[in-house]
Amino acid sequence: MPRRPLLEFEKPLVELEQQIEQIRQLARDSEVDVSQQLHQLESLAARRRQEIFQGLTPAQKIQVARHPHRPSTLDFIQMFCDDWIELHGDRRGNDDQALVGGVGRLGDQPVLLIGHQKGRDTKENVARNFGMATPGGYRKAMRLMEHADRFRLPILSFIDTPGAYAGLQAEEQGQGEAIAVNLREMFRLRVPVIATVIGEGGSGGALGIGVADRLLMFEHSVYTVASPEACASILWRDAAKAPDAATALRITGVDLLELGVVDEVLEEPSGGNNWAPLEAGQTLRAALERHLGELLALSERELKEGRYRKFRAMGRFVEGNSQNPGKID
């Protein structure tokens, strides 16, 4: 059987994966040398996987971003932080497990790390609320960011959520206010802030920890104002049109880099981060260290002004002159 769950568009790989597993089992159970056959099959599977992933549609990228084995915030933190210490609570009686945070070191640099956290199975997903943070989660994140600002710790945030929790209790506790306060206060932070979309980046739930000097995004991650399913239901009253909505929303890294929303798209291993988590971790760490080195050279004023200009430029619409396309009205 395949080593891990395969997505619908990966089904052409099922037979190859089964053959690879059978040969591995044969090698374990006997002294027959099957290394050459195994290498050939693994090479063929890798080539086919690369061909499949080079032509993914936006709707298929969403499936990759939601893969249950995709590395999470805590997975990445454990990959490059040996001395991670998790901090808890919003000091208002809540400790949301859908949003985690703590202090650690990236190389020799002390940093604050915060991010959404999904579960691996149903039980853990229920405990983590499927990565959908409550107002307490965003207030916890803001408390930790204020702590980082006070002690001059750069902030690394990891975004992976379908959106902020929209339940009745969350609304009663001020979900909109909690996210709005985070947006306002993150613009005032005097330390470098780097946000990375490691999976789903959904709506205000993503933006609540996403006001950053640099916004990075993995190749098969998505970042969107609303889920394609929600968009399709609103516009066409038909969730089955989600693939059309995914294309129209321009949610992929290529689109968002072109629109100036993200600063860098990080390449993923063949088959996505779930196939080679350690390689993905090395890619992310190298990018974070590079961007952090550049930001640490800036003054507090330069950081805040640059962050403000970055977000003010988003969504700007300029109409061209039909008679003279090169002229701006």
UniProtKB/Swiss-Prot annotation:
Keywords tagged on the record: ATP-binding, Cytoplasm, Fatty acid biosynthesis, Fatty acid metabolism, Lipid biosynthesis, Lipid metabolism, Nucleotide-binding, Transferase
Pathway entry: Lipid metabolism; malonyl-CoA biosynthesis; malonyl-CoA from acetyl-CoA: step 1/1
Any one biological process term the GO annotation gives: fatty acid biosynthetic process
Molecular-function GO terms, alphabetical: acetyl-CoA carboxylase activity; ATP binding; carboxyl- or carbamoyltransferase activity
Statement: the UniProt record of this protein carries the keyword Metal-binding: no
Family: Belongs to the AccA family.
Protein name as annotated: Acetyl-coenzyme A carboxylase carboxyl transferase subunit alpha
Species of the source: Parasynechococcus marenigrum (strain WH8102)
Gene (name only): accA
